[in-house]
Amino acid sequence: MKYLRNDLREEYERIAKNVPDIEDLQHPLINFSDVLHAYFILADYFTDESSDNIEHMLVGLRSADLLGSALGRQIVSFGGRKKYTDSIEICATLFYGLVKDHAFHDGNKRTALLICTRFSGHWLKNE
């Protein structure tokens, strides 16, 4: 977050201060801080004012509860049995939750894709 524009850094710090991580979501699972990092990196890229091709992205968290709901999908269980145990299944349900819950004003699908490719270790390669 070191190289973010000042306005984005202030918004990131404001949100990060008010939205704590969930204790049950430890590495390798994705937490609030991981998603916020990815979101603000994308926000910085897609609102770059030095470029001729500026995209007008609405920056900000719409609902911390919706983001928590999407993140909580990773640890869903019933009767002591976790619903998702395979890393691909966990990544898929997280992707679905981030896309469908619309926790951010804009950039939900981009954030979901970045999170899943980065943290699953499956980077796309040009071939």
Feature map (PLM): residue ranges:
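FIC/Doc superfamily catalytic core
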Residues: 1-127
